[in-house]
UniProtKB/Swiss-Prot annotation:
The gene is pyrD. This is Dihydroorotate dehydrogenase (quinone). It comes from Aeromonas hydrophila subsp. hydrophila (strain ATCC 7966 / DSM 30187 / BCRC 13018 / CCUG 14551 / JCM 1027 / KCTC 2358 / NCIMB 9240 / NCTC 8049). It catalyses: (S)-dihydroorotate + a quinone = orotate + a quinol. The lineage of its organism: Bacteria, Pseudomonadati, Pseudomonadota, Gammaproteobacteria, Aeromonadales. Pfam families: DHO_dh. Its EC number is 1.3.5.2.
Amino acid sequence: MLYPLARHFLFKLNPEQAHDLSIKYLPRLLGTPLDCFFRHSLPKRPVTVMGLSFANPVGLAAGLDKDGECIDAFGAMGFGFIEVGTVTPRPQSGNDKPRLFRVIPAEGIINRMGFNNKGVDHLVAQVKKAKYQGVIGINIGKNKDTPIEQGKDDYLICMDKVYDQAGYIAVNISSPNTPGLRSLQYGDALDELLAALKVRQQELAAQYKKYVPLAVKIAPDLTPDEINQVAASLIKNGIDGVIATNTTLERDMIYDMPHAAEAGGLSGRPLQHKSTEVIRQLAKALDGALPIIGVGGIDSAMAAREKLAAGASLVQIYSGFIYKGPDLVKEIVTHI
């Protein structure tokens, strides 16, 4: 695999340039002799979660393909599912640049992207065009300029528009880069949002004559009591799954490393243990009521197995994929 060579080139660019270049050119390599460098034929590891059939339990986490423009290329790498987004009702440019930083000594990434995306209508058009046969999750959020009190409306708008094209819908209430968003994870605000989403899910299921599961993505920076409260709310409102976790605001693991003082969410290896502990606590609180998709610092088959042992049914990768490349998918699926 030539990824180490590609990484050497990409890491000479700033992180956002490298990302944009990859998203632009990867689809163009499909169907050419060069796609042999990332196309994988992997062993089947079928699993059924949230009523959906996955060819294997390894997925691409949201954030890498925000606008769904690279689905088939990522699919060729062997992912059992691909989560696109986060997408918002209206296009938005996100936060000021620079907003993406590599913490290379720790194989971590700090981002404060701010839900930059081309809007939900563009994303849905891209998903419709995709030939990928696996499960596509669509991660939805709210626009930055939508008051938090009206945030529920943005989620419902997105849900209406993506429902017919989504394998499952992921509700992102845990990004640290949209002001006030994480407040939706607590108490009455969470209950009110989940209740509204559940009602709309039932309406859309009747309209389209199919049931699309809802999964909620949570932060790692929750206390044990908060994890218990989130679990109770998920069960109470009949949510189908939970994604644990998003990025962390903590910096203890990288305090003396380059970019440690940058604002934003930290992902990658520094998040590995913290996210696994949240999964372990969450699994205990849920007691099998709904499945967990584990994400956070997975950079090896062993790290993936730790997430599964802690209580996850599926896993997702992002930062580990940036550092290790497509062979990481093959390693995890083969040795999980």
